[in-house]
Amino acid sequence: MTSIESDQSCVHIRWMIRRDMASVLAIEGQSFEFPWTEDEFIRCLRQRDCIGMVAERNEEVAGFMIYELHKTRIHILSFAIHPEFRRQSVGTAMVEKLVSKLAYQRRNRIVLEVRETNLPAQLFFRQLGFRATGVLKSFYEDTPEDAFLMQFRYEEESVQEGNAKRFAS
């Protein structure tokens, strides 16, 4: 898919393949109190509009993202970075890759739900131009916890020829 140079080394972003599942499950388990199971990942990824991508650094899976394509939006379903690779621009590179798929007249926004107690994720996405647009009461099946609905909107004027797209809210 793409390679992005960062401060420490190259981040390579590519489509997720079956042999990535063990690494993805390990990252999921280290990142969430209620992680998805392998069956949940497989069931999701078998759907026509559900896509998985991974970020590699030094040929090691450093993070993953599962997202769903809708007519006017992209919905991030699961996203996590291995603890050893956090705060090293891996997550930012993955979100930037997803933003590059937006277009003014087609899919023009990215949405996701973030647990109300997951302040690091809220701050990460806010820093990248996402805004909380609503509260989803008792959203999760595993707890009565609420979720913030966060959204990034594509703005055509934020695109500069020859430069990467800029984030806009």
Which functions belong to the PLM regions below?
Residues 44-45, 118-119, 141-142:
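Short secondary-structure capping/turn micro-motifs that flank functional sites
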Residues 113, 126, 131-147:
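Conserved catalytic-core motifs of GNAT/GCN5-like acyltransferases
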Residues 36-39, 93, 123, 145:
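Generic recognition of short, well-ordered alpha-helical segments
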Residues 2-3:
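A detector for short, charged/polar N-terminal pre-domain segments
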Residues 82-96, 103-105, 109, 115-123, ...:
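Conserved glycine-rich acetyl-CoA-binding loop
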Residues 72-77, 108, 128, 146:
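A generic structural signal for short beta-strands and their flanking turns/coil linkers
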Residues 6-7, 12-86, 95-97, 101-105, ...:
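Acetyl-CoA-dependent GNAT
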